[in-house]
Amino acid sequence: MSDPTRGPILVLGAGAWGTALSVHLARRAQPNMVSLWARDAALAERMAHNRVNSRYLPEIPFPEALLVWASLEDALASWRSRVAGQDGLGLLVLATPVSGLRPLAEAIAKALGPPKDREAVLWLSKGLAVTPEGLLWPNDLVAGPLVSWPRGALTGPSFAQEVARGLPCALTLASTDPVFARQAARACHGGSMRVYASGDLVGAQLGGAMKNVLAIAAGVADGLALGANARAALITRGLAETARLGQSLGAQPQTFLGLATLGDLILTSTGDLSRNRRVGIALAKGQPLAEILSGLGHVAEGVSTAPAIRSLGQAHGVSLPIVQAVCQLLSGSASVAMVLQELLDRDPVDEDPSAHP
């Protein structure tokens, strides 16, 4: 059943997650109210003809209501026209790795200019970018070209394959504007997907970035067969590192116990579908990083995010030993055995993150 309060939604990026979200939203939408654009024009043409994304989700047929675009300009123009003719909030959803956010936002700004009534932008990306201007969060990358657009992050524990299959999940819609967060959450909420609103964009973005780095550490522990105790310790102490850094950034403490941090951390650190965890498992087995990434077939954001998070921690004087360990493994500056021993040999400290770094 369609939701009359939901406006047109255009998902920009036909990877696994962008496709899965499009399929989910289109199952409950009126025809052509949910659209999917693919950067690869040949892929878009195949998807439009075969009604499936054979590259990323070959077993998931597209709902009849889903419209596929090969031209970004045409997709954006059609979306704007449909927003003007419908009630409800119209959403552009940027489903690209962090590295692609700014170019895509710039293309949107060039094609559409300032937002019109009931137009807004979301992103699915999780990470922290190293740029000539410094370390930039997804919000920074999007806000540059789209400064006047209402915007926010849709984040939380969500394996694309499970969302595409219609299995239940719960996500967070975070924005610096709590009112917009609630509006956008309602626009995405429904069916097998629950969406909660949050006004803590800082904490939500940090949680999404940190969990990818910590999942690499959890994967290393699993690859070494260190046991469930070690995995639980890494997840818990990794959460403590996230909370310490979040406190220095002004995030709300409760965010780190929610879906955007703890929920996503548990999923990514334990699930077999986690790309970052698979990177850690392969590192533990001695596989070179370049070989791991070439065989992955998808972007593992934790690889590029780890050194950025380490730099952020150093800038704020926050100790992040697990993040540091992951960086050493990724750079090849230390062996797995050496990194593990360094973590175990650290002096005992108070567990309360406010009592000791």
Which residue stretches match the model-derived regions?
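NAD(P)-dependent Rossmann-like dehydrogenase/reductase catalytic/cofactor-binding core
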Residues: 218-222, 247-357
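Rossmann-like NAD(P)(H) cofactor-binding subdomain of soluble oxidoreductases
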Residues: 68-74, 86-168, 184-186
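NAD(P)+-binding Rossmann beta1-loop-alpha1 motif at the extreme N-terminus of oxidoreductases
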Residues: 1-60, 67-73, 79, 83-89
